[in-house]
Protein backbone atom coordinates (compact mmCIF):
# COMPACT_ATOMS: atom_id res chain seq x y z
CA UNK A 1 0.00 0.00 0.00
CA UNK A 2 1.40 3.39 -0.95
CA UNK A 3 1.76 6.16 1.63
CA UNK A 4 -1.14 8.12 0.18
CA UNK A 5 -3.35 5.05 0.43
CA UNK A 6 -2.22 4.35 3.96
CA UNK A 7 -3.00 7.91 5.02
CA UNK A 8 -6.34 7.71 3.22
CA UNK A 9 -7.17 4.49 5.08
CA UNK A 10 -6.45 6.11 8.42
CA UNK A 11 -8.40 9.23 7.43
CA UNK A 12 -11.27 7.04 6.29
CA UNK A 13 -11.34 5.29 9.65
CA UNK A 14 -11.27 8.64 11.39
CA UNK A 15 -14.05 9.92 9.10
CA UNK A 16 -16.22 6.95 9.98
CA UNK A 17 -15.60 7.67 13.63
CA UNK A 18 -16.62 11.30 13.16
CA UNK A 19 -19.65 10.39 11.07
CA UNK A 20 -21.00 8.11 13.75
CA UNK A 21 -20.75 10.90 16.29
CA UNK A 22 -22.63 13.28 13.99
CA UNK A 23 -25.24 10.62 13.34
CA UNK A 24 -26.06 10.40 17.00
CA UNK A 25 -26.40 14.16 17.25
CA UNK A 26 -23.93 14.15 20.11
CA UNK A 27 -20.92 15.79 18.50
CA UNK A 28 -20.87 18.96 20.58
CA UNK A 29 -21.58 17.09 23.79
CA UNK A 30 -18.81 14.60 23.09
CA UNK A 31 -16.31 17.38 22.41
CA UNK A 32 -17.31 19.21 25.55
CA UNK A 33 -16.82 16.17 27.76
CA UNK A 34 -13.71 14.66 26.18
CA UNK A 35 -11.16 13.50 28.75
CA UNK A 36 -7.58 13.83 27.53
CA UNK A 37 -5.17 11.17 28.78
CA UNK A 38 -1.42 11.71 28.71
CA UNK A 39 0.14 8.74 26.95
CA UNK A 40 3.89 8.09 27.08
CA UNK A 41 5.63 5.68 24.72
CA UNK A 42 9.05 4.91 23.23
CA UNK A 43 7.81 3.96 19.77
CA UNK A 44 9.49 6.50 17.52
CA UNK A 45 7.29 7.43 14.55
CA UNK A 46 4.13 5.86 15.97
CA UNK A 47 2.21 9.01 16.88
CA UNK A 48 0.16 8.76 13.68
CA UNK A 49 -1.01 5.31 14.82
CA UNK A 50 -1.84 6.47 18.32
CA UNK A 51 -3.65 9.55 17.01
CA UNK A 52 -5.81 7.29 14.87
CA UNK A 53 -6.63 5.20 17.95
CA UNK A 54 -7.34 8.40 19.86
CA UNK A 55 -10.04 9.29 17.34
CA UNK A 56 -11.66 5.90 17.90
CA UNK A 57 -11.52 6.23 21.68
CA UNK A 58 -13.00 9.71 21.51
CA UNK A 59 -15.94 8.44 19.49
CA UNK A 60 -16.52 5.39 21.64
CA UNK A 61 -16.13 6.73 25.17
CA UNK A 62 -15.27 10.43 24.96
CA UNK A 63 -11.60 9.89 25.84
CA UNK A 64 -8.66 11.00 23.70
CA UNK A 65 -4.90 10.52 23.90
CA UNK A 66 -2.07 13.03 24.04
CA UNK A 67 0.96 10.97 22.93
CA UNK A 68 4.48 11.87 24.05
CA UNK A 69 7.39 10.06 22.38
CA UNK A 70 10.66 9.14 24.10
CA UNK A 71 13.04 8.02 21.36
CA UNK A 72 15.71 6.88 23.84
CA UNK A 73 14.61 3.70 25.64
CA UNK A 74 16.87 4.24 28.67
CA UNK A 75 15.57 7.78 29.22
CA UNK A 76 12.04 6.47 28.82
CA UNK A 77 12.47 3.81 31.48
CA UNK A 78 14.06 6.29 33.89
CA UNK A 79 11.21 8.75 33.34
CA UNK A 80 8.58 6.12 34.06
CA UNK A 81 10.40 4.81 37.13
CA UNK A 82 10.36 8.35 38.52
CA UNK A 83 6.67 8.76 37.65
CA UNK A 84 5.94 5.56 39.57
CA UNK A 85 7.19 7.22 42.74
CA UNK A 86 5.60 10.64 42.29
CA UNK A 87 2.46 10.00 40.24
CA UNK A 88 3.53 12.92 38.05
CA UNK A 89 3.61 11.55 34.56
CA UNK A 90 1.35 9.76 32.11
CA UNK A 91 -2.05 8.19 32.55
CA UNK A 92 -1.23 5.44 30.04
CA UNK A 93 2.14 4.07 28.97
CA UNK A 94 3.74 1.43 26.81
CA UNK A 95 5.99 -1.16 28.41
CA UNK A 96 7.08 -4.75 27.88
CA UNK A 97 5.74 -8.14 28.90
CA UNK A 98 7.61 -10.98 30.61
CA UNK A 99 10.23 -10.21 33.25
CA UNK A 100 9.99 -6.48 32.59
CA UNK A 101 6.32 -6.60 33.48
CA UNK A 102 7.23 -8.25 36.78
CA UNK A 103 9.60 -5.42 37.64
CA UNK A 104 7.01 -2.80 36.70
CA UNK A 105 4.14 -4.45 38.53
CA UNK A 106 6.00 -5.27 41.72
CA UNK A 107 7.61 -1.83 41.66
CA UNK A 108 4.16 -0.21 41.76
CA UNK A 109 4.20 1.20 38.23
CA UNK A 110 1.03 -0.43 36.93
CA UNK A 111 -2.58 -0.52 38.07
CA UNK A 112 -4.30 -3.90 38.26
CA UNK A 113 -6.60 -4.22 35.22
CA UNK A 114 -7.75 -7.80 35.75
CA UNK A 115 -11.36 -6.59 35.45
CA UNK A 116 -10.62 -5.21 31.97
CA UNK A 117 -9.37 -8.62 30.84
CA UNK A 118 -12.26 -10.49 32.44
CA UNK A 119 -14.80 -8.48 30.47
CA UNK A 120 -12.79 -8.55 27.22
CA UNK A 121 -12.37 -12.33 27.37
CA UNK A 122 -16.07 -12.80 28.14
CA UNK A 123 -17.02 -10.66 25.13
CA UNK A 124 -14.60 -12.50 22.83
CA UNK A 125 -12.39 -9.45 22.27
CA UNK A 126 -9.16 -11.21 23.24
CA UNK A 127 -7.86 -14.72 23.86
CA UNK A 128 -7.22 -15.86 27.40
CA UNK A 129 -4.00 -17.46 26.11
CA UNK A 130 -2.44 -14.00 25.78
CA UNK A 131 -3.26 -12.96 29.33
CA UNK A 132 -0.42 -14.83 31.03
CA UNK A 133 2.19 -12.63 29.31
CA UNK A 134 0.83 -9.64 31.23
CA UNK A 135 0.19 -11.34 34.57
CA UNK A 136 2.21 -11.18 37.74
CA UNK A 137 0.86 -13.55 40.35
CA UNK A 138 -2.90 -13.65 39.87
CA UNK A 139 -3.26 -10.07 38.64
CA UNK A 140 -3.04 -8.63 35.13
CA UNK A 141 -1.38 -5.28 34.53
CA UNK A 142 -1.50 -4.45 30.81
CA UNK A 143 -3.13 -5.14 27.46
CA UNK A 144 -1.20 -6.05 24.29
CA UNK A 145 0.22 -3.21 22.24
CA UNK A 146 -0.09 -5.52 19.30
CA UNK A 147 1.39 -9.01 19.00
CA UNK A 148 4.19 -9.07 16.44
CA UNK A 149 6.12 -11.84 14.73
CA UNK A 150 9.83 -11.42 13.96
CA UNK A 151 10.32 -12.84 10.43
CA UNK A 152 12.81 -11.94 7.72
CA UNK A 153 11.59 -9.16 5.42
CA UNK A 154 13.00 -9.25 1.90
CA UNK A 155 12.75 -7.45 -1.44
CA UNK A 156 10.62 -9.71 -3.59
CA UNK A 157 11.50 -7.94 -6.85
CA UNK A 158 15.24 -8.17 -6.15
CA UNK A 159 14.88 -11.87 -5.40
CA UNK A 160 13.20 -12.36 -8.79
CA UNK A 161 15.80 -10.21 -10.56
CA UNK A 162 18.64 -12.18 -8.96
CA UNK A 163 17.01 -15.58 -9.52
CA UNK A 164 16.54 -16.25 -5.80
CA UNK A 165 13.73 -18.05 -3.99
CA UNK A 166 12.67 -18.07 -0.35
CA UNK A 167 15.02 -20.46 1.47
CA UNK A 168 13.52 -23.52 3.12
CA UNK A 169 16.76 -24.90 4.64
CA UNK A 170 19.79 -23.32 6.29
CA UNK A 171 21.96 -24.34 3.35
CA UNK A 172 19.58 -22.53 1.02
CA UNK A 173 19.59 -19.51 3.34
CA UNK A 174 23.39 -19.39 3.26
CA UNK A 175 23.31 -19.68 -0.53
CA UNK A 176 20.91 -16.72 -0.73
CA UNK A 177 23.19 -14.64 1.52
CA UNK A 178 26.23 -15.51 -0.59
CA UNK A 179 24.38 -14.66 -3.82
CA UNK A 180 23.27 -11.25 -2.52
CA UNK A 181 26.80 -10.55 -1.29
CA UNK A 182 28.10 -11.39 -4.77
CA UNK A 183 25.83 -8.65 -6.16
CA UNK A 184 27.69 -6.10 -4.04
CA UNK A 185 24.87 -5.83 -1.50
CA UNK A 186 25.19 -6.64 2.21
CA UNK A 187 22.70 -9.49 2.63
CA UNK A 188 21.64 -9.16 6.27
CA UNK A 189 20.74 -6.30 8.58
CA UNK A 190 22.39 -6.21 12.01
CA UNK A 191 22.89 -3.33 14.42
CA UNK A 192 24.12 -2.31 17.87
CA UNK A 193 22.58 1.16 17.56
CA UNK A 194 20.87 1.80 20.90
CA UNK A 195 22.41 -1.42 22.30
CA UNK A 196 19.23 -3.51 22.35
CA UNK A 197 19.28 -4.71 18.68
CA UNK A 198 22.35 -6.83 19.40
CA UNK A 199 20.13 -9.59 20.77
CA UNK A 200 18.24 -10.05 17.49
CA UNK A 201 20.66 -12.43 15.80
CA UNK A 202 21.59 -14.10 19.07
CA UNK A 203 18.01 -15.17 19.78
CA UNK A 204 17.34 -16.07 16.15
CA UNK A 205 20.36 -18.34 15.78
CA UNK A 206 19.57 -20.03 19.09
CA UNK A 207 15.98 -20.89 18.15
CA UNK A 208 17.05 -21.95 14.65
CA UNK A 209 19.61 -24.32 16.17
CA UNK A 210 17.49 -25.59 19.05
CA UNK A 211 14.47 -23.80 20.58
CA UNK A 212 14.82 -25.87 23.76
CA UNK A 213 18.39 -24.60 24.10
CA UNK A 214 17.06 -21.04 23.97
CA UNK A 215 14.33 -21.75 26.53
CA UNK A 216 16.78 -23.50 28.86
CA UNK A 217 19.23 -20.61 28.60
CA UNK A 218 16.62 -17.94 29.26
CA UNK A 219 15.23 -19.85 32.25
CA UNK A 220 18.72 -20.29 33.78
CA UNK A 221 18.79 -24.06 33.33
CA UNK A 222 22.07 -23.93 31.40
CA UNK A 223 24.95 -21.47 31.24
CA UNK A 224 26.16 -19.25 28.44
CA UNK A 225 29.36 -21.32 28.44
CA UNK A 226 27.42 -24.49 27.58
CA UNK A 227 29.09 -26.10 24.52
CA UNK A 228 25.85 -25.90 22.54
CA UNK A 229 25.57 -22.16 23.18
CA UNK A 230 29.23 -21.70 22.24
CA UNK A 231 28.51 -23.53 18.99
CA UNK A 232 25.82 -20.97 18.14
CA UNK A 233 28.27 -18.14 18.80
CA UNK A 234 30.73 -19.79 16.44
CA UNK A 235 28.07 -19.97 13.72
CA UNK A 236 27.36 -16.28 14.30
CA UNK A 237 31.07 -15.45 14.16
CA UNK A 238 31.33 -17.27 10.84
CA UNK A 239 28.54 -15.14 9.39
CA UNK A 240 30.23 -11.96 10.66
CA UNK A 241 33.55 -13.00 9.10
CA UNK A 242 31.84 -13.52 5.73
CA UNK A 243 30.75 -9.88 5.73
CA UNK A 244 27.08 -10.75 5.70
CA UNK A 245 25.98 -8.11 8.22
CA UNK A 246 25.51 -4.36 7.90
CA UNK A 247 27.61 -1.92 9.95
CA UNK A 248 27.01 -1.70 13.69
CA UNK A 249 25.52 1.80 13.51
CA UNK A 250 22.85 0.76 11.00
CA UNK A 251 19.32 1.99 11.66
CA UNK A 252 16.57 -0.25 10.35
CA UNK A 253 13.43 1.72 11.17
CA UNK A 254 11.30 4.08 9.10
CA UNK A 255 13.01 5.54 6.05
CA UNK A 256 16.28 3.75 6.84
CA UNK A 257 14.48 0.40 6.68
CA UNK A 258 13.09 1.35 3.29
CA UNK A 259 16.58 2.22 1.99
CA UNK A 260 17.87 -1.19 3.09
CA UNK A 261 14.89 -2.92 1.51
CA UNK A 262 15.32 -1.09 -1.79
CA UNK A 263 18.96 -2.21 -1.96
CA UNK A 264 17.94 -5.82 -1.46
CA UNK A 265 19.26 -6.24 2.09
CA UNK A 266 17.13 -8.61 4.17
CA UNK A 267 15.81 -7.30 7.49
CA UNK A 268 14.95 -9.44 10.54
CA UNK A 269 12.52 -7.25 12.48
CA UNK A 270 9.13 -7.29 14.18
CA UNK A 271 6.04 -7.02 12.01
CA UNK A 272 5.32 -3.75 13.80
CA UNK A 273 7.86 -2.30 11.32
CA UNK A 274 5.78 -3.48 8.37
CA UNK A 275 4.16 -0.06 7.92
CA UNK A 276 7.60 1.45 7.28
CA UNK A 277 7.63 -0.45 4.00
CA UNK A 278 3.95 -0.18 3.05
CA UNK A 279 3.49 3.36 4.38
CA UNK A 280 6.65 5.48 4.43
CA UNK A 281 8.28 3.47 1.67
CA UNK A 282 5.25 3.25 -0.59
CA UNK A 283 6.01 -0.42 -1.27
CA UNK A 284 3.29 -2.94 -2.01
CA UNK A 285 3.24 -5.92 0.32
CA UNK A 286 3.27 -9.26 -1.46
CA UNK A 287 4.46 -7.60 -4.68
CA UNK A 288 7.46 -5.42 -3.85
CA UNK A 289 8.39 -7.10 -0.58
CA UNK A 290 7.37 -10.00 1.64
CA UNK A 291 8.51 -11.94 4.71
CA UNK A 292 9.52 -15.51 5.55
CA UNK A 293 10.23 -17.57 8.65
CA UNK A 294 13.99 -18.08 8.94
CA UNK A 295 14.94 -21.75 8.36
CA UNK A 296 16.30 -24.09 11.01
CA UNK A 297 20.05 -24.51 11.26
CA UNK A 298 19.57 -28.00 12.66
CA UNK A 299 17.96 -30.18 9.95
CA UNK A 300 16.79 -32.66 12.60
CA UNK A 301 14.22 -30.17 13.90
CA UNK A 302 10.73 -31.06 12.70
CA UNK A 303 9.20 -27.59 13.04
CA UNK A 304 10.40 -24.04 12.58
CA UNK A 305 10.37 -21.40 15.30
CA UNK A 306 9.65 -17.69 15.24
CA UNK A 307 10.15 -14.97 17.83
CA UNK A 308 6.98 -13.28 19.06
CA UNK A 309 6.88 -9.89 20.75
CA UNK A 310 3.92 -8.86 22.86
CA UNK A 311 4.22 -5.19 23.71
CA UNK A 312 2.24 -3.81 26.63
CA UNK A 313 0.04 -0.81 27.39
CA UNK A 314 -0.87 -0.18 31.00
CA UNK A 315 -2.21 2.49 33.34
CA UNK A 316 0.03 4.28 35.83
CA UNK A 317 -1.05 3.11 39.28
CA UNK A 318 -0.72 6.62 40.74
CA UNK A 319 -2.14 8.33 37.67
CA UNK A 320 -4.71 11.08 38.23
CA UNK A 321 -7.22 9.66 35.74
CA UNK A 322 -7.14 5.98 36.62
CA UNK A 323 -10.83 5.27 36.04
CA UNK A 324 -10.75 6.87 32.59
CA UNK A 325 -7.48 5.08 31.81
CA UNK A 326 -8.97 1.66 32.57
CA UNK A 327 -12.02 2.54 30.52
CA UNK A 328 -9.76 3.48 27.61
CA UNK A 329 -7.84 0.20 27.85
CA UNK A 330 -11.09 -1.75 27.67
CA UNK A 331 -12.28 0.27 24.67
CA UNK A 332 -8.87 -0.26 23.00
CA UNK A 333 -9.57 -3.99 22.80
CA UNK A 334 -12.96 -3.63 21.12
CA UNK A 335 -13.48 -4.15 17.39
CA UNK A 336 -13.79 -0.49 16.23
CA UNK A 337 -10.50 0.63 17.78
CA UNK A 338 -8.70 -2.61 16.95
CA UNK A 339 -9.73 -2.24 13.29
CA UNK A 340 -8.31 1.29 13.27
CA UNK A 341 -5.09 0.03 14.88
CA UNK A 342 -4.75 -2.79 12.34
CA UNK A 343 -5.05 -0.33 9.46
CA UNK A 344 -2.76 2.30 10.97
CA UNK A 345 -0.04 -0.15 12.06
CA UNK A 346 -0.11 -2.61 9.18
CA UNK A 347 0.29 -5.36 11.78
CA UNK A 348 -1.85 -8.04 13.35
CA UNK A 349 -4.05 -7.29 16.37
CA UNK A 350 -5.06 -9.37 19.40
CA UNK A 351 -8.82 -9.08 18.78
CA UNK A 352 -9.73 -12.23 16.80
CA UNK A 353 -12.80 -10.53 15.29
CA UNK A 354 -10.62 -8.16 13.26
CA UNK A 355 -9.61 -9.69 9.91
CA UNK A 356 -5.99 -9.45 8.80
CA UNK A 357 -5.98 -7.27 5.69
CA UNK A 358 -2.27 -6.67 5.04
CA UNK A 359 -1.06 -9.33 2.55
CA UNK A 360 2.35 -9.77 4.19
CA UNK A 361 0.93 -10.23 7.69
CA UNK A 362 -1.90 -12.38 6.37
CA UNK A 363 0.48 -14.68 4.52
CA UNK A 364 2.89 -14.92 7.43
CA UNK A 365 0.09 -15.65 9.92
CA UNK A 366 -1.27 -18.37 7.65
CA UNK A 367 2.18 -19.94 7.29
CA UNK A 368 2.74 -19.93 11.06
CA UNK A 369 -0.66 -21.52 11.70
CA UNK A 370 -0.51 -24.08 8.87
CA UNK A 371 3.01 -25.23 9.69
CA UNK A 372 2.49 -25.07 13.47
CA UNK A 373 5.56 -22.88 13.85
CA UNK A 374 6.79 -22.62 17.44
CA UNK A 375 6.08 -19.14 18.82
CA UNK A 376 8.79 -18.11 21.28
CA UNK A 377 8.99 -15.06 23.52
CA UNK A 378 11.56 -12.44 22.58
CA UNK A 379 14.91 -12.29 24.43
CA UNK A 380 14.30 -8.72 25.63
CA UNK A 381 11.41 -9.96 27.81
CA UNK A 382 12.95 -13.31 28.77
CA UNK A 383 15.19 -12.65 31.75
CA UNK A 384 15.95 -10.31 34.66
CA UNK A 385 16.19 -6.76 33.33
CA UNK A 386 19.81 -6.08 34.43
CA UNK A 387 20.93 -9.33 32.80
CA UNK A 388 19.33 -8.44 29.48
CA UNK A 389 20.33 -4.77 29.43
CA UNK A 390 23.95 -5.41 30.41
CA UNK A 391 24.01 -8.55 28.29
CA UNK A 392 23.17 -6.71 25.06
CA UNK A 393 26.22 -4.49 25.61
CA UNK A 394 28.41 -7.59 25.76
CA UNK A 395 26.70 -9.01 22.67
CA UNK A 396 27.26 -5.71 20.88
CA UNK A 397 30.98 -5.80 21.67
CA UNK A 398 31.11 -9.30 20.18
CA UNK A 399 29.34 -8.14 17.03
CA UNK A 400 31.84 -5.30 16.60
CA UNK A 401 34.78 -7.67 16.96
CA UNK A 402 35.85 -6.33 20.34
CA UNK A 403 35.34 -9.63 22.17
CA UNK A 404 36.06 -13.23 21.25
CA UNK A 405 33.52 -16.02 21.57
CA UNK A 406 35.23 -17.23 24.75
CA UNK A 407 35.29 -13.76 26.30
CA UNK A 408 31.67 -13.14 25.40
CA UNK A 409 30.28 -16.39 26.75
CA UNK A 410 32.38 -16.20 29.93
CA UNK A 411 31.26 -12.64 30.68
CA UNK A 412 27.62 -13.45 29.96
CA UNK A 413 27.78 -16.51 32.21
CA UNK A 414 29.18 -14.46 35.10
CA UNK A 415 26.56 -11.76 34.57
CA UNK A 416 23.78 -14.35 34.46
CA UNK A 417 24.94 -15.96 37.71
CA UNK A 418 24.91 -12.58 39.41
CA UNK A 419 21.56 -11.33 38.12
CA UNK A 420 19.65 -14.60 38.49
CA UNK A 421 20.82 -14.77 42.11
CA UNK A 422 19.63 -11.20 42.68
CA UNK A 423 16.31 -11.94 40.99
CA UNK A 424 15.75 -15.05 43.08
CA UNK A 425 16.55 -13.18 46.28
CA UNK A 426 14.24 -10.29 45.36
CA UNK A 427 11.21 -12.13 44.00
CA UNK A 428 11.40 -15.80 44.95
CA UNK A 429 11.43 -15.68 48.74
Name what the model sees in each region:
Residues 98-150, 174, 201, 291:
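Hinge/lid segment of periplasmic solute-binding proteins
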Residues 162, 242, 280-345:
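Extracytoplasmic/periplasmic substrate-recognition and gating elements
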Amino acid sequence: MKLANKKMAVLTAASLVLSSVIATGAMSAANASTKVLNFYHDKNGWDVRFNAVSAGLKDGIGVSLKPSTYADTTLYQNTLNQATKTGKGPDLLTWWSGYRMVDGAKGGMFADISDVWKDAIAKGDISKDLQKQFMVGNKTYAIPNGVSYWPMFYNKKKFAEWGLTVPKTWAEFEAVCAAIKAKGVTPLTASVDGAWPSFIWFEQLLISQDPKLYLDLTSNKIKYTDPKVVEVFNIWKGMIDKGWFTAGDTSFFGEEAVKLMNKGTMIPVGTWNNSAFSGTGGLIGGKDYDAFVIPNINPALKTQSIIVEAGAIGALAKGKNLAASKKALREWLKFPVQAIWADASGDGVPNPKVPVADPVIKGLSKYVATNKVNQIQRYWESGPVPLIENGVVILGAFMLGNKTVAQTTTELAALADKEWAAWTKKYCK
